[in-house]
Amino acid sequence: MSEAEARPTNFIRQIIDEDLASGKHDHIQTRFPPEPNGYLHIGHAKSICLNFGIARDYQGQCNLRFDDTNPVKEDIEYVESIKRDVEWLGFSWSGDVRYSSDYFDQLHAYAVELIGKGLAYVDELTPEQIREYRGTLTAPGKNSPYRDRTVQENLALFEKMRNGGFAEGTACLRAKIDMASSFIVMRDPVLYRIKFADHHQTGNKWCIYPMYDFTHCISDALEGITHSLCTLEFQDNRRLYDWVLDNISIPCHPRQYEFSRLNLEYAIMSKRKLNQLVVENVVEGWDDPRMPTISGLRRRGYSASSIREFCVRIGVTKQDNNVEMAALESCIRDDLNENAPRAMAVLDPVKVVIENLPAGHEEFVAMPNHPNKPEMGSRQVAFSREVYIDRADFREEANKQYKRLVLGKEVRLRNAYVIKADRIEKDEQGTITTIYCSYDAETLSKDPADGRKVKGVIHWVSAAHAVPAEFRLYDRLFSVANPAAADDFLSTINPDSLKITQGFVEASLVQAEVEKAYQFEREGYFCADRVYSSAEHLVFNRTVGLRDTWVG
């Protein structure tokens, strides 16, 4: 299959194909325009993959433009995090990073042009009155008493706004369209508002800032964007997008196309609510591994390729739908099953003493780094008289369905020997502290010579060589599929979204690279935590289990 044949197809790509075939466009120019008021989440990844992917596949260009028109909510921290996320996902923007604030002078000039044409006016209604005058879906709005000011009055008042002559909230610039429009967005929308706040790019040069709907279309036009792609909630805004461009003297007129946003179950996609989780310390930060942010998913152990694959699988349509969390988890599970090296870790250890081995015994057994990829090589793992196994892998009594270690029965230690549990030792609380076993010396990576069948295989770590480690077992942050629908979304937090255990890993993991994925055999996929893990104190995050075991 050629690269072109392997491309995902969707209604947007079909439009682009038609535009190129008809000669409407001879090249493709897209953009990704996030507001730097928070970290990007998995929903933004869909837009990133769409916009940058189209530019890549059609040998076009994609700009990274920050929609930085609200200095009160924005921060350079978010700018830097967004750039990191886009690059980590595997994409490169065309030329320099762009900012809507780069165009503040042009935007101001276009606002003056609209005033000069009698298509914009300075309104002195309060924000509350503007909302009241706007009307509802079933009732038309009514005109502001300031709507019929002369062009000269409006030019003078807008200049007064520009010079700081009005207090915040006492004046704004509005488009003069139609207060009876069936589309509320067209009922004299606000174009400029006053904010006395330093801007992370322009400092204190401006005290008036353009609104999104005014800024977005003009920025697209100034950059020569051919296909302006946004999510469905901006569908009605397309009328204002076109109105602004139709009424100013700008040669380029991009077309806006809308696609469905990503709604992921057991997650929140609102940046306002995600910020609330951070501010109220429900999570440790924007990159908490339970967050649906790109940085959170990365820290948890998700690969960029798995997120890109997820975006391919869910596709691009005009129909809003909810995507199961299992679909995202399936992508990382498939990726890591194929590519993650194997290692052994015991998350809830109990000691096993092999009594028919001499004290101080040490040998090394060969273990493949991947059972299906010999090219990934193998490693030598220490085996000794004392090993740790997982507490869940032993029972004093069990039925035939239990294929692990049982008192008086045998099990195989993976890639090592068959052992038999002979006796146990407990503490005063009745907790098993030690399991005493014997081993069959003739069973190193082979069946017993007498033909007896040993069906169970468990993982282990040599006690003498084990490295202590902390394991952070992450699960879904919310206990219901649609937390946004709850009266108080915080009431749906999953109390078991993080469990921390102490155990051991094999010695090869002492130098584990941060965020490098491993399959801990029989446990799941893990990576060393970027924040907390060090050679002196290993901390591993569980990315996802070996299989989907969630019961909502």
Swiss-Prot record:
GO terms for biological process: glutaminyl-tRNA aminoacylation; glutamyl-tRNA aminoacylation. Keywords: Aminoacyl-tRNA synthetase, ATP-binding, Cytoplasm, Ligase, Nucleotide-binding, Protein biosynthesis. It is found in: Cytoplasm. It is an enzyme of class 6 (ligase). Pfam families: tRNA-synt_1c (PF00749), tRNA-synt_1c_C (PF03950), tRNA-synt_1c_C2 (PF20974). L-glutamine binds at D67, Y212. A motif ('HIGH' region) lies at residues 34-44. One of its GO terms (cellular component) is cytosol. ATP binds at residues 35-37, 41-47, 231, 261-262, 269-271. Its EC number is 6.1.1.18. InterPro entries: aa-tRNA-synth_I_CS, Gln-tRNA-synth, Gln/Glu-tRNA_Ligase, Gln_tRNA_ligase_bac, Glu/Gln-tRNA-synth, Glu/Gln-tRNA-synth_Ib_cat-dom, Glu/Gln-tRNA-synth_Ib_codon-bd, Glu_tRNA_lig_a-bdl. Transmembrane segments: none annotated. It comes from the Bacteria. One of its GO terms (molecular function) is ATP binding. It catalyses: tRNA(Gln) + L-glutamine + ATP = L-glutaminyl-tRNA(Gln) + AMP + diphosphate. The keyword Glycoprotein does not apply. A motif ('KMSKS' region) lies at residues 268-272. PANTHER family: GLUTAMATE--TRNA LIGASE, GLUTAMINE-TRNA LIGASE. Belongs to the class-I aminoacyl-tRNA synthetase family. Monomer. NCBIfam families: glnS, PRK14703.1. This is Glutamine--tRNA ligase. It comes from Pectobacterium atrosepticum (strain SCRI 1043 / ATCC BAA-672).
